[in-house]
Amino acid sequence: MKVASFICVAFVCSWAALAQDTTVPDERWPRQFDSGGNHFIIYQPQVDRWKNDRLEARSAVMVTQPGQATPAYGIVSLSARTAVDKESRTVALEDVNVVGATFPAAPSRQAYLADLIRKSLPDWPQMISLDRLLADIAITRAVSNGDNIQLKNEPPRIIVVTEPSVLILIDGEPVFRTVEGTSYRRVINTPALLLFEPLSNRFYLDGDRWWMTAASLNGPWSIATAPPADLARVKAELLEGEQQDPHAHIADLAQAPPTKVLVSTSPAELLVLQGQAQYLPIPTTELVYVTNTDRDIFMDVRSQMFYVLLSGRWFQAKSLQGPWSFVPGAKLPRDFSMIPPDSPKGYVLASIPGTEQAREAVIANQIPQTAEVRRSEPRLNVRYDGDPEFRPIEGTPMQYAVNADTDVILAESRYWACRNAIWFVSDAPQGPWEVTDYIPAEIYTIPPTSPVYRVRYVYVYGCTPDFVYFGYTPGYLGAFVSDGVVVFGTGWWYPGWYGDWWYGWPWTWGFGFRFSYWGGGWFWRPIAPYWWYHHTHATARFYYDHWNTHWRPGDREWIHNNVNVYNRWPQNSVRSRSYPTNPVSPVRPPVQAQPRRDLYAGRDGQIYQHRTDGWYQQNRSGVWNKVTPNPQLEQQRQSRSLGQERHDEFKNRGQVPGIPHTVAPRLPSRPVAPAHPPVPARHR
């Protein structure tokens, strides 16, 4: 269990506190610079431990003093506070301390050289690629495997169809509110624009370019060839106060209506096949996959069992029509772990325990996005639908607000609000609110059965009199570690609040979330390009992380753990990036022109060098002798190569070949829909 209880210090030495340059690149390693008349060459840090925002690492160094022809080779052990920016995939090293320094071939000068290292710290490289560190951690296992929490894995209602269909999700039984000045009643607990006209006893569903109609929510639905004349006006008035037009962000919305409309008042997933299932074999396995769908559907030829991957969880059935049951990833047929990474379905390896892809995903899920928040800003205003109403959090002495537009928790006789991964505190539920550097430890005991569970993944990492250092891991956005893999959503359905407003909670099912590697990171995304035609009729409000939601015309919905919610705050109050004020510029030609100088800091305190003909170790006389490396050294070399590859992928437009470059939207977590027109209105 992580507990965010911290002691503030009066001053934190941060190289990047006044940074202005947000384009500092991560240059190739090693780096070199001059300081105090000495020439330093620093090799890529090797991670020993990374927990919360504290990094412990080793770096091989070369120090050439004035008048010395031969450099001194050593190992520097460092600790630093990390400022992570997942959008730029960079890590700034701040408050760096030299824990120790050894120079095996120069023991008589070791103390002196260590002192030179400490004095040169202000000139050291202060930025490193996140992908380099993650690749190193994948080898060293320098972070934990996550909380491995127990989530709910019961299958949703899985609907398989072979014709163009759309799924309308309603948050429980439909709740109706009269549209002011009309005879229409709106179903407010769905993101779809769904109206009921009692005089004609007809339902009307907005399809952007058409209206569909039915006498019952269960259908059958058909095109309204002559919709009521006032429908267009009602729609325009309702959408006028919306945070976004639920259709505007999809430029390639289907030109024809779906054949079938399905309505579900419980969690559901829609699997659309273009006709009867068609299969292709996966090389080196006894598996086949369904090719005429954008879903991940497999069949094990030996057992004739079907498998489908939904929100990172596996379900199995003897028939595509079910019934489906959850199967732990560790109990999948062994052939799943043998799927070639470069096959069309290679990305599912991230959801198979024990694979390298799953380990990388788990590691990435532990790295926090960090921000420096000014205490005097930002401002928080919590909106309640009526008087504040609180309910108990199961298994704890705490309570949470059920009718607020923000996660508000009553703990230790005070009110704690978490919005956009910043914690606030107040003595009253309505405020006034102020940024806090203390979070009650019991908040980190909130169970997954609670709709405010996600706040457990927002932490305070430190503070000064003027700033608080916050961070959150992808759990805040709905990505959790369970049974050795990363899954999306807790699996629980949380009843929403229905008053003048509808306040809903995050959903796990209904959006076809797929976990795949893209542009240097693992990304959740809905798999269908047309969320209306092929998939679920819903705006982004049902997802996690909703504040200031927006879409851009033509974007495909890529949902990823690199979304930086701190960007929702004014830049003068929250700084989510930390960069050195004076980035280091090499004073000599880049060291990468010397490929033989590939140095590694061994855990045994020795310096190793990799050359084209193998590994060498420097003895106490300064002579390099060829050695047989231990497996860890070779793994370090491979991870360094992988880190460079991933770093280059991200630099090349943040794109993996064959996958379209897209823009990630802001992902909502608590859909809000007013039944009457308070401002700003959403669903009226």
Language-model features: where?
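Early extracytoplasmic/domain-onset interaction patches
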Residues: V24-A60
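Boundary at the C-terminal end of the N-terminal hydrophobic targeting segment
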Residues: A17-D21
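Bacterial N-terminal signal peptides
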Residues: F6-S14
